[in-house]
UniProtKB/Swiss-Prot annotation:
InterPro entries: DNA_mismatch_repair_MutL, DNA_mismatch_S5_2-like, HATPase_C_sf, MutL/Mlh/PMS, MutL/Mlh/Pms-like, MutL_C, MutL_C_dimsub, MutL_C_regsub
GO molecular function: ATP binding; ATP hydrolysis activity; ATP-dependent DNA damage sensor activity; mismatched DNA binding
Disordered: annotated segments: 353-374
Keyword Phosphoprotein attached: no
Protein name: DNA mismatch repair protein MutL
Gene that encodes it: mutL
Keyword Translocase among UniProt keywords: no
């Protein structure tokens, strides 16, 4: 039998390697920016078109390359960073494997221009699919310019797996911010489709953090510093009140290399224990300096995971450093931070008409089999129980309805008729400022005021987004919001839908918007927090749930603008919630799947006393 094992051609081997190194446009951005930093650049420019699918270009003023090095850098495992295996444990540069340029050139059309200081002419190389098309001398300033065009042009399957431009831009933005944060001594600029997104000069770390992450951190940064013989910690943490419900602005850098570490993240979270809610995440920007001999950076294709030879010691030092910084700045434990906006969404006692909406409002993520003790109602045509105020109530039912009945999880659904629900002199009151209790003929209805209001608002906002309307209340004094670049890009992307909800705002700068109005049913006084909360909730939902953008926006705004447990309600407000809930298409469940209402029938209540 003849031999069947063959050596792969270089171009195929490079494409296989590119599968690990070049996963999306952001991977190319990361590699090129890090190469520019390694070259000693003091000014780096990133130019992107079509979210990197059409063009990624990085221009720097680093030391450049000779003609021979320029050609050799496109060969696999060609690097200037290491000479022996021992060098792997003394690495302080970003690159060292010699795979990036060969991998990129195998799946894109690449042009490089580079020149050493003192040389009259530089080198021009054009390469496609690992094949060199042009190699000649050219005029060029000191430094290097690399253009990567039509990424995955020769691998259609890979290109088809790329996400939308907004998603790919978010990943590019993340990579840019990480490199720029790690090197405040370098000036960076970033352009997308000829629009300048960033232009940050050489500056201090605190100023760089504010420039990249948003002005909201200007007054929130707490210095964090610890020196030991084993490791040094420096950087900033955020005040507890700046903690958010989403993980995003948390950065670890080991010897200036961005890493991910759930273990070290836990050290920071432990230090913030009892200062922030358990579901909130603090800001931190921490730099760990350690002898390269004590770490291994060669354990992950993207080098974002590393191994410490004594991880427990690093954990303990980080935890102690953060705790000491919090104590030094007199941050005392507190358990009353409220990250949700308390606003009222009452628009009057009339019922909202949801019959004309074409929307997926029957969102019920909790699934039960027929054997479950609690089953969801299939009825979507709930009619209001009451109309008007307590002395003018008139039930308007066109058909029977189904109501969840759940006492200790033992009751199945019960069908209640108009006669069963009707009772004279109905009494309604609030229980522990959390539940609305109202009497019906067959027993008592318990309504979760927050869950019910979220359902009401969710269906209302879905209608606004799909029917393109939304009334606003204008501000006498507009409010300015400074956002991170990623949040700003997200707001611009969703601008049309956000306006449909009733928000009125203008773009002031690359990271600043001016809010002139909010939805008309939002209680005044919390406008800035509401907009910021909407963004945070949207990001949290995007991470945790697989839902489309409009549903996410509607759920996010409903979550942030619904009344909260602990809010005292008037009788009018309680009746309004009940009326509007029964007018919803899916009144049984809040958008997150939690029950909005349960019924305690008299038979079950009676048996509790036997």
């Amino acid at each position: 039998m003849s031999d069947i094992i063959r050596l792969l051609p270089d171009n195929i081997a490079n494409q296989i390697a590119a599968g690990e190194v070049v996963q999306r446009p952001a991977s190319v951005v990361k590699e090129l920016l890090e190469n520019s930093v390694d070259a000693g650049s003091t000014n780096i420019q990133l130019i992107v078109k079509d979210a990197g699918k059409q063009l990624i270009q990085v221009i720097d003023n680093g030391k450049g390359m000779s003609d021979g090095d320029a050609r050799l850098c496109f060969e696999r495992h060609a690097t200037s960073k290491i000479r022996s295996a021992d060098d792997l444990f003394a690495i302080r540069t970003f690159g060292f494997r010699g795979e990036a340029m060969a991998s990129i050139a195998s799946v894109a059309q690449v042009e490089m221009k580079t020149k050493l200081p003192g040389n009259e002419l530089g080198t021009l190389i054009r390469i496609e699919g690992s094949a060199i098309l042009v190699h000649e001398q050219t005029a060029h300033p000191q430094g290097t310019s690399i253009s990567v065009k039509n990424l995955f042009y020769n691998v259609p399957a890979r290109r088809n797996f790329l996400k939308s431009n907004s998603v790919e831009m978010r990943h590019i933005m993340d990579e840019f911010v990480r490199v720029a944060l790690a090197h405040p001594e370098v000036a960076f600029s970033f352009y997308h489709n000829d629009l300048e997104l960033f232009n940050v000069p050489e500056e201090t770390l605190s100023k760089r953090a504010v420039s990249l992450l948003g002005g909201s951190y200007r007054e929130q940064l707490i210095p964090c510093k610890e020196e030991t013989d084993f490791v040094s910690i420096s950087g900033y943490i955020g005040k507890p009140e700046s903690a958010r419900k989403t993980r995003g602005d948390q950065y670890f850098f080991v010897n200036n290399r961005y890493i991910r570490s759930n273990y070290l993240h836990h050290a920071v979270m432990h230090a913030f224990e009892e200062l922030i809610p358990t579901d909130a995440f603090p800001f931190y920007l921490l730099f760990i300096e350690i002898d390269p001999a004590h770490i291994d950076v060669n354990v992950h294709p993207t080098k974002t995971e590393i191994k410490f030879d004594d991880e427990k010691t690093v954990y303990a030092i980080i935890k102690a450093c953060v705790k000491r910084s919090l104590g030094t700045h007199n941050i005392m434990p507190s358990l009353d931070f409220d990250f949700n906006v308390n606003v009222s969404g009452f628009t009057g006692m009339g019922l909202s008409d949801s019959s004309g909406r074409e929307s997926n409002t029957n969102f019920t993520p909790k699934s039960f089999s027929t054997s479950d003790s609690i089953q969801r109602s299939n009825q979507s045509n709930w009619e209001r129980m009451y109309s008007g105020l307590e002395n003018n109530r008139e039930e308007v039912y066109q058909e029977s309805i189904k109501m969840v009945s759940a006492i200790n999880g033992t009751e199945d659904l019960k069908q209640l008729s108009k006669e069963q629900l009707y009772t004279e002199n109905t009494s309604t009151f609030q229980l522990h400022q959390k539940y609305i209790v109202t009497q019906v003929k067959s027993g008592v209805l318990l309504v979760d005021q927050q869950a019910a209001h979220e359902r009401i608002l969710f269906e209302k906002y879905i209608g606004m987004l799909q029917n393109r309307f939304g009334s606003s209340q204008q501000f006498l004094f507009p409010q300015t919001l400074e956002l991170s670049a990623a949040d700003f890009a997200m707001v611009v992307e969703m601008e049309e839908d956000i306006r449909k909800l009733g928000f009125v705002f203008n773009v002031f700068s690359n990271t600043t918007i001016v809010v002139n109005g909010v939805p008309s049913d939002v209680k005044s006084g919390n406008e800035k927090n509401l907009f910021e909360g909407l963004i945070e909730q949207f990001k949290q939902n995007r991470t945790d749930l697989k839902i489309d953008r409009q549903e996410n926006l509607a759920r996010s705004l409903a979550k942030r603008s619904a009344i909260r447990a602990g809010n005292k309600l008037s009788l009018m407000e309680m009746n309004s919630i009940i009326d509007q809930l029964f007018a919803c298409k899916s009144p049984n469940y809040a958008p997150d799947g939690n029950l909005t209402v349960v019924m305690l029938d008299m038979d079950k209540i009676g048996r509790l006393f036997m």
